[in-house]
Amino acid sequence: ERLHWLCAAGGPATLPDPIALVAFPQGCQYRNRAIHALESAGRRWRIAYESPNLSGLQAAVEGGLGVALLEQRCQTPAMARCDALLPRPAPSELALCMSDTGSRAVHELARLIMDFCGDDKLRQAA
């Protein structure tokens, strides 16, 4: 699923400099992608709020503490997309590696993952 920049509903028409970022702790790929997108676009940023829990991030965004880069399904009614105000992050990539000697269950799981990732809805979201 494509990631979106989310802010509080009725949020600002422009964003502050530096960008107030709401993010998961260091090591999270969403955080890394948000920072990379901002830095690649020459935008300054600061961590305004950090939480290991999605509900904590959602509450911070809803409360207007900053913006977060999250999946669309994480958007609550109290949030709005602000993609037009911020740089688009690089698309997601997924690599699936398995051994030919894997069990039947491993091969079935791999097939399910490939079918899911090959879904037209996912291609359109990216």
What are these regions (language model features)?
Residues H4, A20, R44-I47, A80:
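Conserved beta-strand segments of alpha/beta enzyme cores
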Residues E1, A59-T101:
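Beta-alpha-beta core module
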Residues G56:
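Short active-site alpha-helical segment characteristic of glycosyltransferases
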Residues A13-L15, R43-R46:
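Short, structured loop/turn "capping" segments at alpha-beta junctions
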Residues A20-A41, V106:
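Secondary-structure junction motif
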Residues F24, R44-N53:
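Short beta-strand-to-loop elements that line the ligand-binding cleft
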